[in-house]
C-alpha cells in the first residue's frame, strides 16, 4: 500500500512538473537567434550598433542563471555604445545540452568560440561572471585570437576546499538525481527561487522584480537543473587542470570582485589570478557581494571602456 501511495505521489509530482515547464516556457520565451555549431545549438542575443567602434563585447553568465541576468542592467547599458552579444551557455536558458559531458569550461568554450565564428565576431572583449570566469580564462588560453580582453566579475578560477552543496551532489547521482529533478525540483523550487536569489545578492538588496525580469525560474526545468548541477560538481576538477596555465594568458584582464563575496571567495580566486596573469589588474569593491555587475554597473562599464581604449592605443602604436 505504501509503495502504491509513493508511486502515485511521484506520478502526480511529475505531471505537476511538466505542467510547470510549459507555464515557465510560455512566460519566458526564447529571445534572439539559435546558432548551430558542432555538438550544440546556442541561443544568442545580439544588441547594440553593429558598426560600433572597437571590439564587440560578449557577456557570459554564471551558474543558476541565463543570458538575461547579464543583460539587465549591464548588457542594455553597454548596448548604447557597443555591439553586445549575450549567450546562453549549453544547458541553460534556451541553449539545450546535447551531452552530459558538455559541462566543462573547455567544451563550452569550444562551442562558444564556434558560435562567435559563425557570427563573424572576434576578437572580442569577454565579460564573464562567476562560473563563467573559468570559461573566459579557458577561452583566452585555447582561442587567443578570439579574445581581445577579459573582464572577470567575481570569477571562479581555482580549486577550493569543500564542495558545491549537497543538493548538487544528490542531483548528479545516477537514477536518484533525474528522479528528483523530474518530480520535486520545480514544485519545491517555486518557493525557494526568490529567497535563493536574495541570498546571492547579499549584502546588497536584490532589485525588485529581478527573478521575473531575468527568468531565473527557468532553472527549475528538470534538464536545466541537472545541467547546472553537473556544471558545478565538475568545475573544481576543471579549474585544477587549467589553472597552472593562467600565466600564459597574454590579453589584458581586469578582475572585479567584492570583498563581501561569500559565494566565490576573492582570496581563493581573484587575487591568485591577478598575481599569475602578466597583464591583469584587480579591483576589490568594499562591502560588495557576488553580483558585482548589479552592484556597480557603471564601474564595470568604465573598466570595459578603459580596456577598449587601451587596446585601440596599442593598435595605433603598433601601426606606427
Per-segment meaning from a language model:
Residues 141, 150-181:
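Flexible "cap/lid" loop of the alpha/beta hydrolase fold
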Residues 280-320:
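Catalytic active-site module of serine/aspartate enzymes centered on a nucleophile-bearing elbow/loop
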Residues 47-94:
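Conserved HGGG/HGGXW glycine-rich cap/lid loop of the alpha/beta-hydrolase fold
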Residues 133-144, 150:
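Short glycine-enriched nucleophile-adjacent loop
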Residues 23-24, 164-165, 185-248:
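Conserved alpha/beta-hydrolase catalytic His-Asp/Glu region
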Residues 1-55, 80-82, 122, 309-320:
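Alpha/beta-hydrolase fold catalytic core
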Residues 254-288:
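Conserved loop-alpha-helix segment in the C-terminal half of the alpha/beta-hydrolase fold
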Residues 45-51, 86-131, 163, 302:
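Active-site loop/oxyanion-hole signature of alpha/beta-hydrolase fold enzymes
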Amino acid at each position: 500500500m505504501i509503495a502504491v501511495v509513493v508511486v502515485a505521489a511521484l506520478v502526480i509530482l511529475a505531471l505537476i512538473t511538466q505542467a510547470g515547464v510549459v507555464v515557465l516556457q510560455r512566460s519566458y520565451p526564447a529571445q534572439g537567434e539559435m546558432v548551430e555549431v558542432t555538438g550544440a545549438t546556442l541561443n544568442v542575443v545580439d544588441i547594440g550598433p553593429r558598426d560600433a567602434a572597437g571590439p564587440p563585447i560578449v557577456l557570459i553568465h554564471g551558474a543558476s542563471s541565463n543570458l538575461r541576468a547579464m543583460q539587465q542592467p549591464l548588457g542594455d547599458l553597454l548596448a548604447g555604445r557597443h555591439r553586445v552579444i549575450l549567450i546562453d551557455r549549453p544547458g541553460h536558458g534556451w541553449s539545450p545540452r546535447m551531452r552530459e559531458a558538455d559541462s566543462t569550461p573547455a567544451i563550452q568554450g569550444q562551442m562558444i568560440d564556434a558560435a562567435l565564428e559563425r557570427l563573424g565576431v572576434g576578437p572580442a572583449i569577454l565579460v564573464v561572471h562567476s562560473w563563467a570566469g573559468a570559461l573566459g580564462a579557458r577561452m583566452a588560453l585555447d582561442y587567443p585570437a578570439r579574445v581581445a580582453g577579459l573582464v572577470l566579475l567575481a570569477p571562479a578560477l581555482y580549486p577550493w576546499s569543500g564542495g558545491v552543496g549537497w543538493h548538487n551532489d544528490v542531483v548528479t547521482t545516477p537514477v536518484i538525481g533525474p528522479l528528483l529533478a523530474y518530480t520535486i525540483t520545480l514544485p519545491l523550487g517555486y518557493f525557494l527561487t526568490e529567497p535563493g536569489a536574495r541570498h546571492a545578492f547579499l549584502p546588497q538588496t536584490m532589485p525588485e522584480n529581478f527573478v521575473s525580469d531575468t527568468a531565473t525560474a527557468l532553472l527549475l526545468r528538470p534538464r536545466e537543473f541537472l545541467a547546472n548541477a553537473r556544471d558545478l560538481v565538475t568545475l573544481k576538477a576543471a579549474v585544477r587542470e587549467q589553472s597552472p596555465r593562467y600565466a600564459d594568458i597574454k590579453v589584458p584582464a581586469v578582475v572585479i570582485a567584492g570583498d563581501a563575496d561569500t559565494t566565490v571567495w576573492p582570496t581563493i580566486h581573484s587575487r591568485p589570478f591577478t598575481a599569475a596573469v602578466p597583464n591583469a589588474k584587480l579591483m576589490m569593491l568594499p562591502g560588495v557581494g557576488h553580483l558585482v555587475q548589479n552592484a556597480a554597473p557603471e564601474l564595470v562599464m568604465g573598466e570595459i571602456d578603459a580596456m577598449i581604449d587601451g587596446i585601440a592605443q596599442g593598435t595605433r602604436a603598433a601601426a606606427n
